[in-house]
Amino acid sequence: LGAELGPATESLAGIEYFKNLKQLICNGNTLAELDLSQNTRLTELNCWDNPLPALNLSKNTELVKLNCNYTALAELDLTQNTALTELACEGNPLTSLDLSKNTKLTVLFCPANQLTALDLSKNTALKELLCYSNRLTGLDLTQYKELVHLHCYYNQLTSLDLSQNTALEELLCYENQLTALDLSKNAALIQLNCYNNRLTALDLSENTALTKLFCGYNPLTELDVSRNTKLTELLCHENQLTALDLTHNTALATVYCPNNRLTALDLSKNTALATLACSRNQLTALDLSQNTAITELYCNNNQLAALDLSRNTALTELYCNGNRLTTLDLSRNTELTKIYCDDNPLTELNISNLSKIEEIVFGDNPEINVIANSQTVVSDEVRHYMDGKRKTP
């Protein structure tokens, strides 16, 4: 027997008569109280998004799944709910959470509370732990051999021991204060997001299953991804990298490496590349002749004197402003909708055949010659801009 209530329900008076109720879904209402003391057969409760100041579940010993996200609970007593396997209590003002009796718990979702500590020493069956956006300064995970997903970002962690979590596939630990991260035992790892920590080194040589790597906003001076041949997404922006070897990463579709110190970037093996952001580096050349699948290119604020895009016919967005370009031929890039090439000493810009331009900026350059033909189609706003900025051919 189950019950699902629609929105705008203010009271559940009379629910005590449903002695055999097993599932109750009453989320998104205005319930200020919820008495389930007579519903002892209840196994699943979804009461999220209600202004509940308290929730007494001491009589609901058969409860297996509980979702009380975004209520007003300052306390949550689950000591009698020993059958619980899944708990979601996000967005409450909880300062503590006692789960010592919930030894069957496999999924714990407790983000956006005010937790400063989380003792999970009795919850060795955990497979998913999402405890982000709290105030945690430490997290002991040594007992969780089965842990697959860990989201502990937006906390105050200074260290993270994952040596026993060999089943871990997804690790999101960004926005902490980590100075080191040992992943040598996490060979099953598929996704890693460790951006905005204090990492000076990152050894990924044992993480050959990795497909997504986000490690931006760290003081990394080098990054070796030569063994991570399955990578499809790499975001390593805002580091201190002087070199980046991607010749072994042929599956890459997205590379995001702005704000480093790169002087060269070899992309000849990355034929699947669709999005490239390499702005604010020290690149003097950029060969994209093998990257025919690329649709978005952000190479602004480098030192490029030339840019050949004749083979990149799938390109839809181009940001090459802030370089040293004197000419730019885009006549073969007929899918382009956005072009930003300002802050270059351009004397010639060829937009012949372009019929999809929505935005174009080439700066206040009275010497520029904009070449167009009958196939060139721009909006009235774009044409007005062009007429005011270009020299008449």
What are these regions (language model features)?
Residues K65, L108, H149, Q191, ...:
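N-terminal non-cleavable signal-anchor helices
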Residues L1-L34, N39:
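LRR N-terminal entry segment and analogous cap-like coil->beta motifs
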Residues Y17-L21, Q38-L42, P51, K59-L63, ...:
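Leucine-rich repeat
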Residues L12-I15, L34-L36, L55, L76, ...:
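Canonical leucine-rich repeat
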Residues D35, D77, P111, D140, ...:
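Intrinsic low-complexity/disordered segments
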Residues L1-L5, L24-C26, T43-C47, V64-C68, ...:
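Conserved hydrophobic beta-strand positions in leucine-rich repeat
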